[in-house]
Amino acid sequence: MPKVKRSRKPPPDGWELVEPTLDELDQKMREAETEPHEGKRKVESLWPIFRLHHQRSRYIFDLFYKRKAISRELYKYCIRGGYADKNLIAKWKKQGYENLCCLRCIQTRDTNFGTNCICRVPKGKLEVGRIIECTHCGCRGCSG
C-alpha cells in the first residue's frame, strides 16, 4: 500500500474512519510478504497476499456501494491511492461476478485450454465431496 503523501492535498472527509482498518490490513500484508515459505508449494506462498488484497478491496467496495458510508470523493481517493483494485471492483458490480476472488481466475489466457479457473465452476456441477482449491489464489469456490 502506498504511503499517504499529505503535503500535496489533504485526504477527503471520512478518511479518519477508514484509515485504521486500511493500516491494519497493510500491516497484515507486510507480515504475509515476509512470512517464510518453507514447506509450502510455490503457489501457496502467494495465497495470503491475494486474500488480503481481496479483503482490502472488498472493504472499500462495501463501504461505498453496500453501506454507502463513504463519499464518492473518498472512494476515488482510495482507488487512486492504490488501497483498492478498481478492476476487481468493476467486476463485482457485474452480475455473476459478485463474489469473484481475483482477476486471474477469469483470465482465459493463463490456462491450457482457454477456460476459467476451477473455482469459477458452480458447486452444483462439481463432484460431490470433491474439495477444490484454486491454484492462483487458494479460493475454494467463488461462483456460488
Curated annotation (Swiss-Prot):
Transmembrane segments: none annotated. Identified in the spliceosome C complex. GO terms for biological process: mRNA splicing, via spliceosome. The keyword Ligase does not apply. Belongs to the BUD31 (G10) family. Involved in pre-mRNA splicing process. It comes from the Eukaryota. Its main location: nucleus. It is found in: Nucleus. Keywords: mRNA processing, mRNA splicing, Nucleus, Spliceosome. A motif (Nuclear localization signal) lies at residues 2-10. The keyword Nucleus applies. GO terms for cellular component: spliceosomal complex. The gene is bud31. This is Protein BUD31 homolog.
